[in-house]
Amino acid sequence: MVNKKYTSGQNENEKLMDRIEKLDLSESNILNNDFITNELRKVYPEYNRKPLKGFKQLVEKAMNQIIKNLSSCESSENEDGDNKMEESDGDDVEIISPPLPPPSSNILNEQLTSQYKQNIKNTPPTTTTTTPAKRNRDENIPSNVNSNNNNNNNNNAINSNTTTNNVNTPNSKPKKKLKNSSNGNNVFQFSNNNNNNGNNKDNNLSNGLIPTINFSNLGGVESCLRDIREHIEYPICHPEIYSHLGVEPPRGILLHGPSGCGKTLLAKAIAGELKVPLFAISATEITSGVSGESEARVRTLFSNAIAQAPCIIFIDEIDAIAPKRESASKDMERRIVSQLLTCMDSLNYLSSNNSTNEPNEQTEQQQQQQQDIIEVDSQATTTTTASNNNNKQQKNDFKKGHVIVIGATNRPESLDTALRIGGRFDKEICLGIPDQTARCKILKVITSKMRLENNFDYEEIATLTPGYVGADINLLVKEAATNSVNRIFTSNLNGASSSSSSSSSSTTNINNIGLSTELLISKEPLEPEKLNSLYIEMIDFKKALKKVVPAAKREGFATIPNVTWDDVGALSGVREELTNSILRPIRYPKKYKNMGIDSPAGVLMYGPPGCGKTLLAKAIASECQANFISVKGPELLNKYVGESERAVRQVFQRAAASSPCVIFFDEFDALAPKRGGGDGGGNQATERVVNQLLTEMDGLEKRSEVFIIAATNRPDIIDAAMCRPGRLDKMVYVPLPSPEERCEILKTLTHKIPIHQDVDLIKVGTDLRCHSFSGADLSLLVKEAANHAISRGFDNNSTEPDTVTMEDFIFALSKIKPSVSRKDELMYDKLNNDINKSRDKKPNNSNNIPITNNIPITNNNNNMIIN
């Protein structure tokens, strides 16, 4: 093709057409505007500076012009050929065929020409017929695509002997736009199979599939099955009951919970259990860059679902397309929300029409069919069969139009409020973080087809996995299986290498690597006897626990399975108080409910720094095997208005979704100082946070099975409303340890350290230099003694294992000083006495309490007067 030089005044469209013809499209199977646009932007960088939408329109215009030019050229060539044949000699001796056209130098021209012929051939005639044609159910399939092509043969190929006379007919004019309903662009498709590449969105919108899983593939969802049965199973299986009672059946269910808790799996299991089609799409499959197409996809989804009713529509991550309209950043988001609301409301309207109008029309048709059956066969059995079929048809027609919509999100607070009212998403089901019993059931379901050892303990694994959701447990099982395979190969390597005993350790390692390659590549399959002896053992799961980090831990949950009461020395009084307030209500909830105690307790621990307040909170959460959320006071504060309050709400919502749960607020004085500019120096931002905390702790909504532990070393600046009953009921003072308690703490800290026999921990704990030592100071003392023992070993060039001697402790005592001064210690003791006096304060003379009348006396201004 001759290269053209364009001047500044030449038509831009011709330049673009010339560049399209120069493109190398030999390796492409599908040509459309998007593909050609991307190729042009790759080859010619100046097109990247143009707006994408406007440039696509230019490409579309150029493609249409190319098709028009090709068709006109082909028509003129055919006319010239016919004229030459007529003017040729009438000699019958030899028939000379017209010369074949030279092969085209551009593949695009050939493909566009063949596609143009195919479209003209398949164009329906303009003459109308009296018999109405049955409308194709799937209008999205182009006319030139064979929808029944199930093999790899090209059934859509064009016959090379087809004449071009149809090109010149008036009814065969090329169309301006060859639209495909998937994206609204010109599509030129040349493929050898029926794979509709790029149209997976439309397939999900138009095809409902019945899943193969059911409730037997789930575990730990027994608490949700009752709501599912009431709001999904009953309306789909027996809608006639609701119509007979004159009530509208439920239409929508909103599943919310943390990521990986099983929302999508539950929706598929519901459809599989009921044997109804499921339209499962992601919210991003609905969105489109073309204005109005996103709303059209929502309408298409609901219309196709109504055509296949009864069925279920499942929209995953619905918060992506239905955010709050007042805070939406784009008009498209508002339009999608409005369209979704309209479609959900139309389900009730269609249901009422189907229950009144459609059965009557169907009844007339069924009566006519019944008469035809009686005319053909007058036997009574045929009449009875026809009437039974009519009753079944009426029942099926009655079910027509009932569609359940299930939405899934992990951010329900971001949904538009109009979606969460009656008639739309009637019921909200929370799938929180499973407890120990639910984790055990999930583990049994996931490992049902795995070969586990005979004495496998499900309860122990469930105990060691607090905060794990279904996806985390599934990942844990896969990691355990990987560890099992590695253990099997390692045992084979050790068995094989033990036979060869004439090599050094380094040589043995090299041989093991070579043997591993031999086992993986050239080794024959293991015998059935050996395979039967292979199992996944408990040790494989315990190794996997060290590698798998639950997703909830990244969202603020903290799983502390390693801290127990054994790691906490002394503090027996504080431990007893925490056991009565938190541990027992979590372990034995029924006993407390039978006594009428349903509100969980809150505990405020205060005292000097380093006395073990945070360690106690971790230990109590680990002992009761509850979910644990650790919140540092300042991390919830945000400079933007409303963000701090939202963070507080999110913490309590997350805890309620994963109950029983313990929320631990460290440095609580930074989060809840006194309001009104008191000693804490509160301001408007912190006052709003305090108000939000007060509401969440003891507001209109009960915090069921959500326990609160707060720790601070400045209880005097905390807002007084926080410490009233119903919020932080108990105030526990954690003092500096006594000499006896210091000895117990030292024993706890040194149980993993090699200590010489001459070390007397009681003497160290009662030493006067340890006076006013906190737990953190004692931990630093032990660490300093161990470091001195290591340094002494290096100085003496000793090869024996180092042990901590009494000299090391004496050296550490000479260097470590108490972190809490004597003045601070007295201040904390005085503060504790003041708090106890304020709570134990009673009237001096209880017998002289003035008694007032039952009816209050008011003055003329309606002010109460107390005598």
UniProtKB/Swiss-Prot annotation:
The keyword Hydrolase does not apply. Residues 834-843 have a biased composition (Basic and acidic residues). One of its GO terms (molecular function) is ATP hydrolysis activity. Its main location: nucleus. It is found in: Nucleus, Nucleolus; Nucleus, Nucleoplasm. One of its GO terms (biological process) is positive regulation of protein binding. ATP binds at residues 257-264, 607-614. The keyword Kinase does not apply. InterPro entries: AAA+_ATPase, AAA_ATPase_domain, AAA_lid_3, ATPase_AAA_core, NLV2_N_sf, NVL2_nucleolin-bd, P-loop_NTPase. One of its GO terms (cellular component) is nucleoplasm. Keywords: ATP-binding, Nucleotide-binding, Nucleus, Repeat, Ribosome biogenesis. Residues 123-132, 141-172, 180-203, 844-855 have a biased composition (Low complexity). SMART domains: AAA (SM00382). Residues 110-122 have a biased composition (Polar residues). Residues 70-203, 351-370, 834-855 are annotated as: Disordered. Involved in ribosome biogenesis. Belongs to the AAA ATPase family. PANTHER family: AAA-FAMILY ATPASE, NUCLEAR VALOSIN-CONTAINING PROTEIN-LIKE. This is Putative ribosome biogenesis ATPase nvl. The lineage of its organism: Eukaryota, Amoebozoa, Evosea, Eumycetozoa, Dictyostelia.
